[in-house]
Amino acid sequence: RGPLSGDCLDLVVERHHSQGWYLLRGNHEEFVLDCGGPDQPLSGPVFEMKRFAHFALAQVVDHVDLLRRLPDEFEQEGPNGQLLRIVHASMRSNRDGIYPMTPEEEIRRQIAPAPAVFVTGHTHRPLMRQVDDTLVVNIGSVGSPFDKDRRAGYGQFTWHRDHWQAEIVR
């Protein structure tokens, strides 16, 4: 989403191939893919609500098949079996965000089955929160942070001795 969607996608695809970056589908990718459907209006109020996605689609039209194939989640198991799971929003939906004020009972449902580390990003607001035995991390956003800090935000996750270590980088 933004003026250089095609360039951004090219960069992360190149990093996927050269450095092993993992790519996931989020709600914006779904918006863009929906705009390419045969029943989408090209004018009127519905089009105007989705104009941003039509603009992005025009920039990434050569990568539509790649966007369709993106997985909804990624999991990495540590040497001792601790699971790191990454999704766009929650296990229920890529539009079901975890916020600082979300009650723990709700988070338990959003991350089930609970891994050692659950990584999300949909809300564009950085967050690290322990819920039972799970570290819940919202990595924020590189291009559109919603926490009044305009610096790019992303997460780094490394295996350290016997556990996952999480860091939000700004």
What are these regions (language model features)?
Residues 12, 26, 67, 88, ...:
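Divalent metal-coordination and catalytic microenvironments
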Residues 101-129, 134-142:
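Anionic-ligand binding region
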Residues 75-85, 131-135, 164:
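Beta-strand-turn-beta hairpins that frame and shape the catalytic cleft
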Residues 1-18:
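N-terminal active-site segment of His-dependent metallophosphoesterases
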Residues 87-89, 95-100, 129-132, 148-151:
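A short secondary-structure junction signal
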Residues 129-170:
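Acidic, His/Gly-rich catalytic cores of divalent-metal-dependent hydrolytic chemistry
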Residues 1-3, 28-33, 94, 117-130, ...:
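Active-site environment of divalent metal-dependent phosphoester hydrolases
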Residues 14-76, 80-83, 100-114:
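Active-site neighborhood of divalent metal-dependent phosphoester bond hydrolases
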